Amino acid sequence: MVKPSKILEKIKKRTEPVAEPVVEEESDEEIIEQEGSEEEEEIVEEESEEEEEEVEEENKNIEENKKDQSIYTKKRVLFTSTRGIGSKYRHLMADLISLIPHSKKEDKIDDRKTLSLINETCEMKSCNYAILFDVRKGTDCFLWMAKTPLGPTVKFHITNVHTLDELQMTGNCLKGSRPFLHFDKSFDSEVHLQLIKELITQIYSTPKGHVKSKPFFDHVFSFFYQDGRIWFRNYQISDQEFKKDSLLTEIGPRMIMHIDKIFSDGFGGSVLYSNPNYVSPNNTRSDHKLSKANKYIKRKYQKGKAEERQKISFIEPSEVDTVFDN
């Protein structure tokens, strides 16, 4: 038998209300602090994400710049010449090699008919551009500038050449320094001049960060277009004492380039431009010989006319002159 006291205890336990868990109410300051901390965490996370994105973009840009610079700093210009080059043009080539630090010299070419083989030589020597001094008959020098192997190629006839040793100018520049390139306004007037300007810029401009180059500019390569010819000059940038302006002092060398033809490929291909005002040195020599021959013919003709006039003007002696001879 269950005691009634135990039954009453069970009934009381069932009827008693269950005590609810006590929840501590947070104060307004604690709520504000929690909200502020959450906002700060969100801001920090956003800033960290933005920084990560910026770092990734910078790394991408650095990699792209490294690729571009690696391609640009590997730019090389191959210098070569044909057999029979004279001392004057050989010294000119040596001067240009000393002024262009990203240049590379190659042996002479035996056969002029196989100029397209220079493209293979450039590929073997890992050169992007080529300059050829093609001397014919010991006096005529043709300068070929080419972007190998796809082109274009520009052929010039060089005249009025003066080397550094010949000029002995007061200007001077450090070997390996980078040059400024200055072009006349007339280079933007015609299409073929714009092409020549771009090719000269790519060949003569020293790439930034090149191994053999110095990280500053102290001379200027100037190209002027006048009388259908390109005039080349090299000046030193020297600062005058007690003056803000800079002074240009000529260094040398000097040369005048007459445009002959522009080809589509490297040392060959179709002719993109042919200068109608260009006269080859062979034609000038033949004209000079013809003028000399014409002078000789005129002199002989005048001599024959003089003899005829003398015969006509000759007066035979009269009988009066011989009266007193007996």
From Swiss-Prot:
Biased composition (Acidic residues): 22-57
Molecular function in Gene Ontology: RNA binding; rRNA primary transcript binding
Protein name (database record): Ribosome biogenesis protein BRX1 homolog
Major localisation: nucleus
Residue stretches of biased makeup (Basic and acidic residues): 1-17
Species the sequence originates in: Dictyostelium discoideum
Lineage, broadest ranks: Eukaryota, Amoebozoa, Evosea, Eumycetozoa, Dictyostelia
Family the UniProt entry places it in: Belongs to the BRX1 family.
Record-level GO cellular component terms: nucleolus
UniProt-listed Gene3D superfamilies: Probable brix-domain ribosomal biogenesis protein
